[in-house]
């Protein structure tokens, strides 16, 4: 836990939407999202239980709210967002809070696509957009962690 933040983790589980070509390849290939820890290999959802103050949105008590309404209430209360590029990142940008995009692939790699003043994302929102590019898809998250410290004022 850094700086007293709580983290709400949100990732669809391939059952909420019609799968795209990447999800189809993942499902057909039997691939799972996982990470090595001192406790062995665990899924990205399992990591939510592994770390303190990390909560899986899919497991939170929604009360009488539907999934989307609950998600919007959580997003409204957030201090900011860390997201991958794509539609989920666009949604995060609507709340006028700092957004940190991690971009390993896609059209967002183009210079200025997310950051220039007249970019698509800036036209949709008035959020402070920050971007970490991982063009070689090296999954070296040190740049992301450094940018998180700057954007969210961690020490």
Residue ranges and their predicted role:
Residues 5-109:
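Donor-binding and catalytic core of enzymes assembling or modifying cell-surface/extracellular glycoconjugates
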Residues 89-155:
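Nucleotide-sugar donor-binding patch of glycosyltransferase catalytic domains
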Residues 1-2:
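Histidine-anchored nucleotide/phosphate-binding helix
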């Amino acid at each position: 836990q850094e700086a007293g933040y709580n983290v709400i983790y949100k990732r669809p589980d391939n059952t909420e939407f019609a799968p795209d070509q990447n999800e189809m390849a993942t499902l057909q290939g039997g691939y799972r999202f996982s990470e090595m820890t001192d406790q062995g290999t665990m899924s990205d959802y399992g990591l939510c239980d592994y770390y303190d103050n990390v909560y899986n949105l899919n497991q939170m008590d929604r009360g009488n709210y539907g999934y989307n309404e609950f998600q919007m209430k959580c997003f409204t209360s957030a201090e900011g967002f860390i997201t991958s590029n794509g539609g989920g990142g666009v949604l995060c940008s609507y709340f006028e809070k700092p957004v940190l995009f991690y971009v390993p692939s896609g059209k967002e790699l183009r210079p200025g696509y997310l950051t220039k003043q007249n970019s698509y994302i800036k036209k949709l929102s008035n959020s402070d957009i920050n971007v970490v590019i991982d063009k070689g898809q090296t999954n070296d998250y040190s740049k992301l962690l450094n940018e998180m410290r700057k954007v969210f004022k961690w020490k």
